[in-house]
Amino acid sequence: MTENPDQKEKLINNMELLPNMVNEAIRLISPVIYMRRTTTEETQVGEQKIGPQEKVVLYYGAANRDPDIFTNPDKFDIERENAKKHLAFGYGRHLCLGKHMANMQLAEVYKQILERFPDMHQSDEWKVVPNNFTHSISEMPVTFKPE
């Protein structure tokens, strides 16, 4: 939100956008970077044939920024109509059981931060945990005025 002050202001003025903002944030920065799956039968993706029992890697960031699905996929837009179509929590029988809990927790955290510290902004670069499987922030310095 601090990188997109116009979107932050829009959200502060209309908190009904909060659930969609959470989906849009997750779409842009998926908590899981990739997942490996094993095919059960022969299939084809584009021109690539994939045999049964082959390992495939699914990169969520690529899917969540697919320009055929998301217009201006690199833009953070809390009013994006299809933000909920992200695949950050998987899909179908592989859907993460914690998806709804994570969405509720993120919505509540953002609500509390925006209500208590509306002027909060990032004061330095954020640091990511060195990990090739999950995308986690280890440090994000912020500045705000106390209540």
Predicted regions located by residue number:
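Cytochrome P450
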Residues: 1-147
